[in-house]
UniProtKB/Swiss-Prot annotation:
Record Pfam families: Ribosomal_S10 (PF00338)
Gene source species: Acinetobacter baylyi (strain ATCC 33305 / BD413 / ADP1)
Annotated gene: rpsJ
Primary role: Involved in the binding of tRNA to the ribosomes.
Signal peptide, first to last residue: none
Subunit structure as annotated in this protein's UniProt entry: Part of the 30S ribosomal subunit.
Lineage: Bacteria, Pseudomonadati, Pseudomonadota, Gammaproteobacteria, Moraxellales
Protein name per the record: Small ribosomal subunit protein uS10
Entry's family note: Belongs to the universal ribosomal protein uS10 family.
Keyword Ribosomal protein included in the entry's annotation: yes
Gene Ontology biological-process annotations: translation
Gene Ontology cellular-component annotations: ribonucleoprotein complex; ribosome
Molecular functions per Gene Ontology: structural constituent of ribosome; tRNA binding
Keyword field: Ribonucleoprotein, Ribosomal protein
SUPFAM superfamilies: Ribosomal protein S10
Length: 103
């Protein structure tokens, strides 16, 4: 496992949850003796929606909503067997989407 790399991508709508989860992952990886790069903040995706408030007239009256998607990237450069076991047992928040890629 010494020449492999683990890339972890996190997505969330809440920036506090994603920062807390990324901190847990980094602490777990460092505790098991792996070298960690990150968390790297990726660009925030902002989706905006405009909705008419009136069903008939008053085109100028609109409500505006937005959804922000926060992303973080963590690279574990030299993972050990303990690192992989600890990451599998790690319990993260429900609002965070985790994608793990071995490379």
């Amino acid at each position: 496992m010494s020449n492999q790399r683990i890339r972890i991508r996190l997505k969330s709508f809440d920036h506090r949850l994603i920062d807390q989860s990324s901190q847990e992952i980094v602490e777990t990886a460092k505790r098991t003796g792996a070298q960690v790069c990150g968390p790297i903040p990726m660009p925030t995706r902002i989706e905006r929606f405009n909705v008419l408030t009136s069903p008939h007239v008053n085109k100028d009256a609109r409500d505006q909503y937005e959804i922000r998607t926060y992303k973080r990237l963590i690279d574990i450069v030299q993972p050990t067997d303990k690192t992989v076991d600890a990451l599998m047992k790690l319990d993260l928040a429900a609002g965070v989407d985790v994608q793990i890629a071995l490379g």
